[in-house]
Amino acid sequence: MKRIFTVLLTLLLSLSFCFSQNPQAEAFLREDISRVACNYHGYEFKDYKYSRVPKGYEMVYLSHYGRHGSRYMTYTKGHEYVIKKLTQLQKAGLLNADGEELLRQTKEMHVMNEKNLHNLSPKGYQEHARIAERMFAREKKFFRKDLRIRGIASTADRCQSSMNSFCGALVRQNPRLTMDLDSKEEYMSYISNTSGFEETVHDKAGLIIDSLNNTILNPREAIRPLVTDLDEAYKLFNRPVRFEKYLHVVASIAEDLPVHYRPMKLIPFEEARKLWYIKNLDLYLNHCNSVEFGDIRIPYARSLAEDFITKADESLSGGCYDVDLRFGHDYPLMAFFSYIGLDRFNERYDRNHTDNWISSRDMHMATNLQIEFFRGKKGDVIVRFIHNDRETKIPALGPGPFYDWETVKAYWRDRY
């Protein structure tokens, strides 16, 4: 009976779903096919202009959260499944040259991932070092002082390594900086708070995602570029959707690894766009301010918002730290951005319109938020938000980019 209910619910979900097509998202993906990787996409370094700080204000503090940089896989089953199916096709003499190359390269990446499971990749180290250098360059006057910096990281090795790379780059710019770095389980209650998330959101959102996997994907089109005889090849797939999904994983993580091969180019654009859409939807429903689950998911970020407030007020009141750095993960960061009402995370979308939010633009590897604090001659404090090197805003509080800190605090504490 339970299985019948699940099947019926999945059918109803698929019938009520509309595969919307946001022209902005489509253009963004066409410009660079690697962006189909969603949150596996690497950091894009771009140059931005910044507003002049109001006269009479001086930077006195900076608070930050950065997602770990590009990494190796955290599991092996995706590569293993793709290798298994491609090997079957090879034995049947059905792989074309692109399919053969995909098999060879996937085997090499699989070995690489097994040796470095969960760890930061060389690209990830480079991302955080470069982000730190750009932050230093933007605020040279502040960072050339004898500052004391506190850094905390998730207990995951890739986050600790990101912190070390980031802070090492800062010290190379100014050897007089004092660093107090730490990583403890106790920090996880706010730096990566997802306790109870599986029961409250994940399983319910999963039903929606499963319904799309089986209704809008066309795995024949994903397999076509790899084989010599599509009809014969397709007979060897008992779960073709699974192959397509894992092919997307293999193609997505490739750009994070120390390899030049880019399998994403093998997936036809229309199919790649659908894969992006589903993964983008998955991320939004599970961790952003969705109509369906936002009221349940976003309050998990309150503890992180309080950490930002508490540490900022400590510093502004004469505390010993001039900079607070945090290194964690994308899931809590998405919820936090939604909680604080950050631009591009402040709008609420239902499951039919989540492609108005673009994960590979706003939550790629090494995504970070830097909040700069400036004190005026009268003692008042204003703040500016820098998201992935881009000056941004809190739309509910006005156009910005500078906001009164007391107003920001009151707004955050009144949320949820």
Regions found by a protein language model. Give the residues of each.
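Bacterial Sec-dependent N-terminal signal peptides
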Residues: 1-23
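Signature for phosphate-centric chemistry
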Residues: 21-148, 154-324, 328-416
